[in-house]
Amino acid sequence: MPDSMMDMEHRDHQLHRQQQQSHHHQPPRLTASTSTFAPPAPAGSQSEERDRDRDRERDHHLHHHQSNNVASSPLPVTASIQLHQQQPQQQQQQQPLTQLQQPQLREREHHQQQQQQQQQMMQQPQQQQQMQQPQQQLPHSHHALMQQSQQQQAIHRAEARRADEEISDKASTCGKLLIFLSVALVIMTLPFSLFVCFKVVQEYERAVIFRLGRLMQGGAKGPGIFFILPCIDSYARVDLRTRTYDVPPQEVLTKDSVTVSVDAVVYYRVSNATVSIANVENAHHSTRLLAQTTLRNTMGTRHLHEILSERMTISGTMQVQLDEATDAWGIKVERVEIKDVRLPVQLQRAMAAEAEAAREARAKVIAAEGEQKASRALREASEVIGDSPAALQLRYLQTLNTISAEKNSTIVFPLPIDLITYFLKTNEATTQQNARAAAAAIGNTPPPLQLAPQQQMGQQQQPQYQQPQQQQQQYQPQQQQQQQQQQPQQQDQLYQQGQQISSAM
């Protein structure tokens, strides 16, 4: 509908321009009733005729557009009749309107429609929010109150600044007067005023100057000579060297409910002399108190084993916290170190007992591992000695050398191994002979009386017992001969070993 209205306005404007051009360029027309030349109509009548023609054309377009809409939409017959009845009434109302009033009315109507649409669009999301989030009204109201309070605070601050500026303007005149008087006083007492006006600051110091209670522009002065005016200037010396502070022992309850006493040392220095004087009353005292509280807070969030094993980490966290807190005071914390952690006596005893038990268990494990390794070594040595008798002889000689090296009054001289082996061999031979003799005696006993078949069996078995006896008789002279041959060799070996031992001693 707004597009059709715009088209109609455009067409009306074009028709109006065409009519103006036709009135300017066309000659006067003759009427149909008479053949005489009609006089030109006045300007007011012409404008009224143009307005009527334009209104008729507009009404015609409106009627045509409404008829199209009625044909396209399924309206009832009564609605179409009402529309036809309303059209002449609208035409009668619009005819007396002038050419300047019609566009104004249209613009007003269009503007009102736009405002109504915007209001509807703005009300829809608000209604949705109220339906969906009814519980968020209190936070919004609280937020609005906070904003109002912030605005009021900003207004008060602005008013205070204005008052300060007014006071400063008034004081500036007095300050200028006092400065002029002090300069005049210096000039009048020139030889003596030099001792009062010139000051010296060391390399590690800075001077913060106040003139009439305000900081001088340019920051702190120094090192070297600086100038002050008497009676109106004052200054404060600030030492920039690093200072140490021993934090006294602090009783702290750890996270696992153990009471410990912890002390530390803090290294800090003044990084900004002006800020350290202007922002805090006593920067050094404030830093020391803050170090104590930071030590308590940091230790209270740790377990006992963390305090004992992670001292470097705790020191680093304390250094960062102190540095951030003292930055507004012009203080730079360079380092923090934990000195000592004192535990209660009962806890020390319990920890000592636990450590001792752990050490004993560790020692037992080590001893068991050593015995296991020693048994393995002895087993390997016995296997080697059993495989080669010469290794046993060498071991015997080594023991003799170690015994002879000791400075003792009594020397134990053990028997030679060869002699021991000889006795062992003879003992084995005698045992074997006794066993064989017993077997032979058993074989020579007569069998008991039995039946004929058993006697036959006894006769068959008799030669079996006689065979070992014959073998023993043959073996005994051979063994005796071997022993007789080995005796001189063994005696020679024993004699040589005795000489070696005597020479070693």
UniProtKB/Swiss-Prot annotation:
Instruction: Give the Basic and acidic residues compositional bias ranges.
Output: 47-60
Q: Output the Pfam families linked to this UniProt entry.
A: Band_7 (PF01145)
Question: Its membrane topology, per UniProt?
Answer: Single-pass membrane protein
Report the outcome of residue 297 to D.
Answer: In RNA edited version
- Which residue ranges run through the membrane? 178-198
- InterPro entries found in the cross-reference section: Band-7_stomatin-like, Band_7, Band_7/SPFH_dom_sf, Band_7/stomatin-like_CS, Stomatin_HflK_fam
| Keyword presence, Electron transport | no
Q: Which protein are we looking at?
A: Band 7 protein CG42540
Q: Name its species.
A: Drosophila melanogaster
